[in-house]
Amino acid sequence: MTLEYRRIGRLPTCIGNERIRIAADGEVSHSRNTVECEPDVTWSAPWRPAGRLDAAALARLTQQIIDTGILGLQPESIDETAEGGTREEMDIAIAEREYRLVAENINPPPFRAVVKLLWGVMFELGF
């Protein structure tokens, strides 16, 4: 399983944009912008290692993600009436299948559940 989560502000600044990545080998990385980006660039901060999940923890997380129901969501959940706010993106690969999901100014419960799982991983790693 691999996963990358991105939270991108819909404001004219990239400060505060944040992302979490879990690699197939269990390596967990994080990035949060604390300085302004170059024009038309989303990220000013590099990936930083946050820790590593062992095979059992990665398998458990994979099953927890599946159990949220996120893989059954429509690819995009967007509130077209909102201005500003936040766009969240998630790329998930489990076995041979890849999923790209977007939630913009809306909180589908399965999407939110996976974000909570990711922050739980970060907390457990002492980040």
What would you call each of these model-derived segments?
Residues 24-28:
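Structural signal for glycine-centered tight turns and loop->strand junctions in beta-sheet-rich domains
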Residues 1-12, 17-18, 56-127:
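Short, well-ordered, aromatic-rich surface patches in folded extracellular/luminal domains
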Residues 31-33, 104:
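Surface loops and adjacent helix of pleckstrin homology
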Residues 33-72:
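A short-motif feature that recognizes glycine-rich, charge-decorated loops
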Residues 29-31, 44, 77:
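Generic serine detector
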Residues 18-22, 48-51, 90:
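Hydrophobic/aromatic beta-strand elements that line small-molecule binding cavities or substrate pockets
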